[in-house]
């Protein structure tokens, strides 16, 4: 049994929270089920962080019975969802997602992360929590209402920005290997340091992550990617050995190689720098995934040329092909999100290449045509991709990049090429020349599209119709 430490904390609760908590106190006293607020809500209150409107309650008794009684006394009598197999109940009130569970103790079998559950005390319930900062509880009992129950010094760990487990971390992570990902996620989100024995235990138990479903691993990975400094999470994943297991394609970006005095940058660190560079400009998870995958094919395309050194020709094309494979393996969505990332990986060199030459209107038109509505995202990615430490190069790249961006804006306003579709359809071509679907239709359509993109004709119906007639005559077609 752990002797609980308590703190008198002046918590600030909203009007809705205070009303709810006092109602819970009254019902728990009536049922003789001592009740406590636990988990992330407590942690985030102490950190003055916004929380996601979900609050977990533990009672020494039946969580389901307590939830049903409370809901019956609240305005609107919210519907209670019962999960009898887990001894939990859930309902929504005043925009808050509330979950009630009876205090329990847990034990695990090695081949599964699903616990064997028994009724327990508050101390038992706190002992089963993943980290000390998540094992604190706020009492809702009349005798010590609002007191923080903190048996594992979670309050001190919050102040010291330390992440540690309440018990032996090797047992914690072996029992529930997903907690290794959660440790790295919390360290990344909160900018905490993982205590050394806890960090060592992740390395010791890394192979256990293989019993966790891919969906749960990817969910934690996405939360790391959405953090303020996602690179921290990837570095921790790499240092603990988890990265090589859960995302070997990214792990393979690591390292440098020197041949004949010529080396190349570490593509892993470069990619993480690009990812961090994006953070101030976007919370879009899929744009951040595009940053992660933009150079993913460099190991597969790396070659050494004695004259110019290391090359990665075609890595954008190979990388776009790899995107679908990676999304499928990681159980990421394979529809619009995957196609968006695939497109940005394929096009990520194009805007940068335009800054290195006398850019033509034709080249910009083609980029506008291919990028479509994703042009702004592509430009954000390309701007983040400028990671050279040479200040003069950065200045030159940025100036040239701004010039290209302005030219894109000017051409877009003039030619309206975003989501461009030629004004002449295949149906009109077939109708005009009495054709069935076939080679000639494709030739005429391609000819019109190329003429517009090259600036030979404007993007309007009359010019395109005349070009259609001319090309039809050239092909010997009659209308």
Regions found by a protein language model. Give the residues of each.
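Catalytic cores of the polymerase beta-like nucleotidyltransferase superfamily
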Residues: 1-479
């Amino acid at each position: 049994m752990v002797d609980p430490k308590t703190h008198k904390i002046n918590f600030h609760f909203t009007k809705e929270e205070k009303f709810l908590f006092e109602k819970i106190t009254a019902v728990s006293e009536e049922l003789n089920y001592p009740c406590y607020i636990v988990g992330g809500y407590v942690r985030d209150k102490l950190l003055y962080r916004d929380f996601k409107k979900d609050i977990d309650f533990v009672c020494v008794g039946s969580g389901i019975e307590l939830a049903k009684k409370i809901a019956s006394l609240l305005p609107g009598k919210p519907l209670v969802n019962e999960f009898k197999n887990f001894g939990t109940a859930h309902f929504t009130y005043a925009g808050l997602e509330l979950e009630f569970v009876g205090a329990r103790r847990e034990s695990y079998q090695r081949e599964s992360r699903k616990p064997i559950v028994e009724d327990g005390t508050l101390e038992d319930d706190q002992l089963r929590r993943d980290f000390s900062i998540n094992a604190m509880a706020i009492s809702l009992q009349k005798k010590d209402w609002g007191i923080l129950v903190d048996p594992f010094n979670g309050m001190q760990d919050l102040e010291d920005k330390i992440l540690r487990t309440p018990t032996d971390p090797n047992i914690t992570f072996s029992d529930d290997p997903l907690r290794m990902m959660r440790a790295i996620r919390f360290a990344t989100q909160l900018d905490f340091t993982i205590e050394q024995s806890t960090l060592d235990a992740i390395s010791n138990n890394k192979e256990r992550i293989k019993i966790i479903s891919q969906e749960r691993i990817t969910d934690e990975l996405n939360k790391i990617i959405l953090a303020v400094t996602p690179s921290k999470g990837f570095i921790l994943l790499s240092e603990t050995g988890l990265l090589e297991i859960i995302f070997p394609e990214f792990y393979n970006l690591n390292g440098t190689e020197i041949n004949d005095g010529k080396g190349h940058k570490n593509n892993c660190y470069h990619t993480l720098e690009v990812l961090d560079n994006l953070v101030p400009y976007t919370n879009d998870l899929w744009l951040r995934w595009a940053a992660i995958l933009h150079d993913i094919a460099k190991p597969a395309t790396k070659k050494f040329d004695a004259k110019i050194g290391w090359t990665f020709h075609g890595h954008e094309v190979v990388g776009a092909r790899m995107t679908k494979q990676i999304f499928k393996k990681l159980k990421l969505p394979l529809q619009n999100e995957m196609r968006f990332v695939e497109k940005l990986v394929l096009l990520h060199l194009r805007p940068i290449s335009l800054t290195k030459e006398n850019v033509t209107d034709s080249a910009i038109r083609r980029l506008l045509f291919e990028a479509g509505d994703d042009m702004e995202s592509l430009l954000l990615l390309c701007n983040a991709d400028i990671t050279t430490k040479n200040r003069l190069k950065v200045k030159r790249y940025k100036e040239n990049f701004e010039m290209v961006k302005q030219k894109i804006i000017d051409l877009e306003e003039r030619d309206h090429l975003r989501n461009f579709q030629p004004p002449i359809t295949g149906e009109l071509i077939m109708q005009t020349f009495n054709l069935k679907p076939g080679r000639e239709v494709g030739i005429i359509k391609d000819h019109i599209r190329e003429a517009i993109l090259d600036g030979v004709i404007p993007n309007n119906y009359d010019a395109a119709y005349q070009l259609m007639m001319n090309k039809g005559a050239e092909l010997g077609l009659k209308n």
